[in-house]
């Protein structure tokens, strides 16, 4: 069996997320599977590294699929980019070991979150950032971020859909940056629970607005109560930035 790794970029604004939902084709996975299956002449399933939600974007999503047929990588890339909608782009196709699995073999993921932090709206970024019109205290946000780095039980930063055997995840780094009207948050870790990144960003926004004390973060982690974080950051500002294997 031949195994192929895809590197993918997409604008998630109009899609219902990565994961195919029954017969609903308006997903990233569904669109790519449809084109690959047409190319090969049989039903093909692709496995994505991250099952991004509706409205979330990707700069470097990774997926893989298997085929009985030996394929030429550059021809696959050309075919996919010719027939996929222009808000999905295949940036690389590579034949890999038959045991490579995009989801289970990933060692680290990095997400970037963009907040437009000006009083006025930014019409060009409304689908690609979250607008917070009150000035955020970035210094306090950085202090709060320090408490989230490391290995913790992140139950409080997940939602009810997160029913994993273990809720412990390790955050390798969590940066808060200011740049030309934006506050950007970059988080890297060994894995993330459902909505964990958006809840982390939501908590940092609450800290930045003075609604939550930075020093309360350790107690929130310890309590493991989901209702202690009231802000779920919008999907529009979230980007899957990088995946390491």
From Swiss-Prot:
Protein origin, superkingdom: Bacteria
InterPro entries for the chain: PsdUridine_synth_cat_dom_sf, PsdUridine_synth_TruA, PsdUridine_synth_TruA_a/b_dom, PsdUridine_synth_TruA_C, TruA/RsuA/RluB/E/F_N
Signal peptide range: none
An example Gene Ontology molecular-function term: RNA binding
Enzyme type, top EC level: isomerase
UniProt-listed Pfam families: PseudoU_synth_1
Residues involved in substrate binding: 111
EC number(s) from the headed UniProt entry: 5.4.99.12
Keywords, ordered alphabetically: Isomerase, tRNA processing
BP terms from Gene Ontology: tRNA pseudouridine synthesis
Catalytic activity: uridine(38/39/40) in tRNA = pseudouridine(38/39/40) in tRNA
Subunit structure: Homodimer.
HAMAP family in the record: TruA
Family the UniProt entry places it in: Belongs to the tRNA pseudouridine synthase TruA family.
The protein's name: tRNA pseudouridine synthase A 2
Gene: truA2
């Amino acid at each position: 069996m031949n195994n192929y790794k895809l590197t993918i970029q997409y604008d998630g604004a109009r899609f219902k997320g990565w994961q195919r939902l029954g017969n609903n084709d308006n997903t990233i996975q569904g669109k790519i599977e449809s084109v690959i299956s047409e190319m090969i002449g049989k039903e093909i399933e692709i496995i994505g590294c991250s099952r991004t939600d509706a409205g979330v974007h990707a700069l470097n999503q990774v997926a893989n699929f298997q085929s009985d047929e030996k394929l030429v990588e550059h021809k696959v890339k050309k075919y996919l980019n010719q027939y996929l909608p222009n808000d999905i782009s295949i940036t690389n196709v590579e034949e890999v070991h038959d045991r490579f699995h995009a989801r289970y073999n990933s060692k680290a993921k990095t997400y970037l979150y963009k907040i437009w932090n000006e009083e006025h709206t930014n019409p060009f970024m409304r689908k690609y950032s979250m607008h917070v019109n009150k000035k955020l205290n970035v210094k306090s946000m950085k202090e709060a971020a320090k408490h989230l780095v490391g290995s913790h039980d992140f139950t409080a930063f997940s939602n009810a859909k997160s029913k994993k055997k273990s809720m412990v995840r390790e955050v390798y780094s969590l940066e808060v940056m200011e740049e030309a009207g934006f506050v950007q948050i970059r988080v890297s870790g060994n894995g993330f629970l459902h909505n964990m990144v958006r809840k982390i960003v939501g908590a940092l926004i609450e800290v930045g607005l003075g609604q939550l004390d930075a020093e309360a973060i350790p107690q929130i982690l310890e309590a493991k109560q989901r209702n202690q974080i009231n802000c779920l950051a919008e999907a529009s500002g979230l980007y899957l930035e990088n995946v390491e294997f």
